[in-house]
Amino acid sequence: MGAEQSGDADHKHSDFSASVVPSPAKHRAKMDDIVVVAQGTQSLRNIHNDPDVIKLQEIPTFQPLLKGVLSGQTSPSTVCLEKLDSAQVLQLCVRYQDHLHQCAEAVAFDQNALVKRIKEMDLSVEALFSIMQERQKRYAKYAEQIQKVNEMSMILRRIQMGIDQTVPLMERLNNMLPESLFWMLPMEHITFALDCLSYAWIRCFLA
């Protein structure tokens, strides 16, 4: 009976081990994990014939004008600056001078045009001012003459009032005279004499 139990245990252990061992399909490696170490058919690149490398080699090396301003340098005073080519600097200065000269010529041309226009405007303003002055003088004379006319009208009204008051008095005086001193004049003659007197007085006033 013990032999049977041991036989059964061995049979169960073999069955369990057979069930635990994974199948070869589960241990199949993925394509990403495969590394090929064999030499391929592609030929090696020659860096000497590479166009990108050739272009990089054609770029000249250069340094900044002020090497001391670089962040990696701690003592810029010890760095010796490279000298610039005087011919190129002179050419740069000459071109800049030509540019400034052209700008100055353009500004001078515009300035001359503005000055000419300002002179023309000054002449126009002066001519207009002279015309306005002459017109103002003419109107001042007209105003003075109108003032004289107003004064003359007032004088004539006063003279007319004086004549109107004088004629009845002269008539009364003429009627009161005796016959020996009677000097009867027509009223038209008396009025005409007074008008002539007033006219002469007005001419003296206007002169």
Curated annotation (Swiss-Prot):
Annotated transmembrane regions: none
Biological process terms in GO annotation: lysosome localization; organelle transport along microtubule; positive regulation of anterograde synaptic vesicle transport
InterPro entries found in the cross-reference section: TBORCS5 (IPR018780)
Superkingdom of this protein's organism: Eukaryota
Keywords (A to Z) from UniProt: Lipoprotein, Lysosome, Membrane
Membrane topology note: Lipid-anchor
Pfam families: LOH1CR12 (PF10158)
CDD domains tied to this protein: BORCS5-like
Subcellular location: Lysosome membrane
Major location (coarse): membrane
Keyword rRNA processing: no
Gene Ontology CC: one annotated term: BORC complex
Presence of the UniProt keyword Membrane in the record: yes
Residue span of region Disordered: 1-24
Function (record text): As part of a BORC-like complex may play a role in lysosomes movement and localization at the cell periphery. Associated with the cytosolic face of lysosomes, this complex may couple lysosomes to microtubule plus-end-directed kinesin motor.
Family: Belongs to the BORCS5 family.
Protein name listed in UniProt: BLOC-1-related complex subunit 5
Species of the source: Danio rerio (Zebrafish)
UniProt lineage: Eukaryota, Metazoa, Chordata, Craniata, Vertebrata
